From Swiss-Prot:
Protein name, UniProt field: Eukaryotic initiation factor 4A-7
EC number: 3.6.4.13
GO cellular component: cytoplasmic stress granule
Reactions accelerated catalytically: ATP + H2O = ADP + phosphate + H(+)
Subunit structure: eIF4F is a multi-subunit complex, the composition of which varies with external and internal environmental conditions. It is composed of at least EIF4A, EIF4E and EIF4G.
DEAD box, short sequence motif: residues: 189-192
InterPro entries assigned: DEAD/DEAH_box_helicase_dom, Helicase_ATP-bd, Helicase_C-like, P-loop_NTPase, RNA-helicase_DEAD-box_CS, RNA_helicase_DEAD_Q_motif
Chain span(s) of sequence motif Q motif: 40-68
Species in which this protein is naturally found: Nicotiana tabacum (Common tobacco)
Role played: ATP-dependent RNA helicase which is a subunit of the eIF4F complex involved in cap recognition and is required for mRNA binding to ribosome. In the current model of translation initiation, eIF4A unwinds RNA secondary structures in the 5'-UTR of mRNAs which is necessary to allow efficient binding of the small ribosomal subunit, and subsequent scanning for the initiator codon.
Domain Helicase ATP-binding per the UniProt entry, residue ranges: 71-241
GO biological process, one term: cytoplasmic translational initiation
DNA-binding in keyword set: no
Family as reported in the entry's similarity comment: Belongs to the DEAD box helicase family. eIF4A subfamily.
Length: 413
């Protein structure tokens, strides 16, 4: 969220609103149109029969709030900016919109979806393929850390949708392995991360190569003003579906903190929790890759079965670890913020922030794992003296109260 807070200060949610007004000024109403139609069921949305079959087979019964308002405008071909918290079915919203509009008789890339991490791109690929199963959709994920030749071979054979990370997608466009001629839909997922300084230039480069008349969808959990500002350059009369600040409360997830006197005592606190609680699956977040390795080693020496994943590991190793965690053969995953957005594990009941995130907005991506699609979850934050300011910032940012962990925590899981 660079540029929102003065250097050296913590993020203040009030600056978000002031900055957005300043950026958009009096043109705000002209640039955005709010979209307020609500559909209480998937059947009422006018979707293809085989898409509905895929949606129900995937396990959806009733559309979430973002799906009730977000699927239809995308299906109508409108440019859309949609904001909803992590775990609310955002991915299925744009996947449904894409799948509804594809011409399946034309085996050419018609939709391009960009995501900030390999894990998230692969997760989107899985959702797109599952929802489009009865439609015969061909989807491919172009991500770094995989074979360029294999990407070229699959793209040459023909796909309807490409999901990928900006670097590899731009490489495929540059090599002309991915031909943009038939692309009519362009989606940015996790736009807050995508449009951060690291990816902005690559996204511009990709956008320049796409056909001029293209539908653009921007989907994100948080929507910093710089993301809104940049979308002005890409989008034509977009409709906006933004969650009001007061609504971003991560409903259904109970949030607690534990005061820990010293950093060195966090390990004892963690082990005590695992000895007293019956936990099905949990994710533990720390702030550095080195700490992932350190904590994994310490937990294993105390006979706790844990898995670990971070950005220094090669893609194949990370895939194997995530597969084990999804299948339940590993119950505890230790990781960093880098991979928070790619973890989609339905049975996660507990998220532990061993370290509080360094940015308030990352808190959402971390604990949004623990109560996906209405499943209840618990988030526990370890807080040392130096963290008190950040805990206060997080509570103000999301308009939530995080209470001290009660003695009867076992009853909550």
């Amino acid at each position: 969220m660079a540029g929102l807070a003065p250097e050296g200060s913590q993020f203040d949610a009030r600056q978000y609103d002031a900055k957005m007004t300043e950026l958009l000024g009096t043109e705000q109403e002209e640039f955005f149109t709010s979209y307020d139609e609500v559909y209480d069921s998937f059947d009422a949305m006018g979707l293809q029969e085989n898409l509905l079959r895929g949606i129900y087979a995937y396990g959806f019964e009733k559309p979430s709030a973002i799906q009730q308002r977000g699927i239809v405008p995308f299906c109508k071909g409108l440019d859309v900016i949609q904001q909803a918290q992590s775990g609310t079915g955002k991915t299925a919203t744009f996947c449904s919109g894409v799948l509804q509009q594809l011409d399946y008789s034309l085996v050419e890339c018609q939709a391009l979806v960009l995501a900030p991490t390999r894990e998230l791109a692969q997760q989107i690929e899985k959702v797109m393929r599952a929802l489009g199963d009865y439609l015969g959709v061909k989807v491919h994920a172009c991500v770094g850390g995989t074979s360029v030749r294999e990407d070229q071979r699959i793209l040459q054979s023909g796909v309807h949708v490409v999901v990928g990370t900006p670097g590899r997608v731009f490489d495929m466009l540059r090599r002309q392995s991915l031909r943009p001629d038939h692309i009519k839909m362009f989606v940015l997922d996790e736009a807050d991360e995508m449009l951060s300084r690291g990816f902005k230039d690559q996204i511009y480069d990709i956008f320049q190569l796409l056909p001029p008349k293209i539908q653009v969808g921007v989907f994100s959990a948080t929507m910093p003003p710089e993301a809104l500002e940049i979308t002005r350059k890409f989008m034509n009369k977009p409709v906006r579906i933004l969650v009001k600040r007061d609504d971003v409360t991560l409903e259904g997830i109970k949030q607690f903190y534990v005061n820990v006197d010293k950093e060195e005592w966090k390990l004892e606190t963690l082990c005590d929790l695992y000895e007293t609680l019956a936990i099905t699956q949990s994710v533990i977040f720390v702030n550095t890759r080195r700490k992932v390795d350190w904590l994994t080693d310490k937990m294993r020496t105390r006979d706790h079965t844990v898995s670990a994943t971070h950005g220094d590991m090669d893609q194949n190793t990370r895939d194997i670890i995530m597969r084990e965690f999804r299948s339940g053969s590993s119950r505890v995953l230790i990781t960093t913020d880098l991979l928070a957005r790619g973890i989609d594990v339905q049975q996660v009941s507990l998220v532990i922030n061993y370290d509080l995130p360094t940015q308030p907005e990352n808190y959402l991506h971390r604990i949004g794992r623990s109560g996906r699609f209405g499943r209840k979850g618990v988030a526990i934050n370890f807080v040392i003296k130096d963290d008190e300011r950040m805990l206060s910032d997080i509570q103000r940012f999301y308009n939530v109260v995080i209470e001290e962990l009660p003695a009867n925590v076992a009853d909550l899981l």
